[in-house]
Amino acid sequence: MTICQFFLQGRCRFGDRCWNEHPRGGGGRPHSAGPVRGAGGGWGAASQRYANVIQPPIFKHSTWGGSGDGGGFSGASDFGSPGNKSAVFSQNRFSALSSAHPADGFSDEEQRLLDCVAKDMATWESSGQWMFSCYSPEAGKPNVSGFREFSAEEVRLEYYNCSANNNTENYINSVNQLVQERRNRLQELKALNASGKESLLSQLKNAVTQPLPSLGFGGQQASSFGFPSFPVSSSSGAASFSFKANPSVPPGNAAAVGSSAAASNPPTFGVTSSPSVPNPVGSGNSSAPSAASFSFKTSGTTSGCGTSGLSGFGSSAAANSSSTAPLPVSATPSAATGTSQSGASSASAAQTAGASGHNVTSAPSAVPNGIASDKLYTPRSELTAEELEQFEAKRFTLGKIPLKPPPIDLLYL
């Protein structure tokens, strides 16, 4: 019968009901060759037939860990002996990470912050982003020193001011100086030495965060562009820009942006005013209004509609009009105003203005100044041959259209 290998290993779960043979000691068995491991070892005396079976080693608590008897894993090697435990397990692969004193003298948080600054500088240099900007490694941290902050609009305005003063070369040199300063500071932050790291960390820890400027209407907002921090002339008018009304300008006389000093007197509602040519930005002309005259505040004088500080709503600058004073509702347009108004439109405007109480103006006409326009027709004796030819033709010729009313015999109702 086949010998049960599980019984030899001591883990047969069928016991006496096993189909294979469980060898026992005693008579009727083949001649025994004696015990395999002696009196105190193993599973006892076994036959020569099963002498080649490899027996599992017997582990004892007394010999595990090394006791000098040569059993188990102890013996000459003394593996795991109490005297050598410290020598075997003294090396810890994570001991460098758990060290309380790093080799460079910086904590993990400080080293992470320094690595972040160096990485940001490399990204900033290769990305081609706007160079005249401030920098902070994290939210809540103060800005790193050495970087000037100017917007593209401020740099453009400074160019206009220098160009108006024929000082473009100074502008170019100043911008190149700023670019070189920024490049040097960027390279310094990319490869910081020990003293530079300490200086940067102390700056990020001990610097005082300045309060943000007020951006609301009525608040003062001064730009640093044009100040001594920018190496260009400080004559720029952008430094005085404010949403606050200029106290030197009387209430109600604030001119619109880009308008000349001739338009400082505000026209009333719907009045035709004289045209004005706006001065270019940064022309340097002292008579041109500065940015400080720009204001969102209304006039201090509260009166009827059309008297606010800004130019009147609905007002238009007619190229052929010389009137700067409003016409009353009941007034009839005269020849001096250079405008014409039909009877129907005059009555309609009078009714509308009478209901609202606002001043109105007459509609502009193509008739030049000095020519009366209150006639409905012109006698033939006052017309030239060319004008009569145009009135008698079926269509007017472009460039030869008469500026006078036609004769009465050519009026068809």
Swiss-Prot record:
The stretch of residues making up the signal peptide is none
Biased-composition ranges for Low complexity? 321-357
The segments carrying the FG repeats are 14-15, 79-80, 217-218, 225-226, 269-270, 313-314
Q: Which GO terms describe its biological process?
A: mRNA transport; protein transport
Q: Which domain of life is it from?
A: Eukaryota
A GO term, aspect molecular function: nuclear export signal receptor activity
For membrane topology, the record states:
Peripheral membrane protein
Localization per Swiss-Prot or TrEMBL: Nucleus, Nuclear pore complex; Nucleus membrane
What does the UniProt keyword field contain?
Membrane, Metal-binding, mRNA transport, Nuclear pore complex, Nucleus, Protein transport, Repeat, Translocation, Transport, Zinc, Zinc-finger
Cellular component terms (Gene Ontology) = nuclear membrane; nuclear pore
Q: What does this protein do?
A: Required for the export of mRNAs containing poly(A) tails from the nucleus into the cytoplasm.
Q: How does it assemble?
A: Probable component of the nuclear pore complex (NPC).
Q: What is known of its domains?
A: The FG repeats are interaction sites for karyopherins (importins, exportins) and form probably an affinity gradient, guiding the transport proteins unidirectionally with their cargo through the NPC.
Q: What is this protein called?
A: Nucleoporin NUP42
Q: Which organism is it from?
A: Gallus gallus (Chicken)
Q: Which gene name belongs to this protein?
A: NUP42
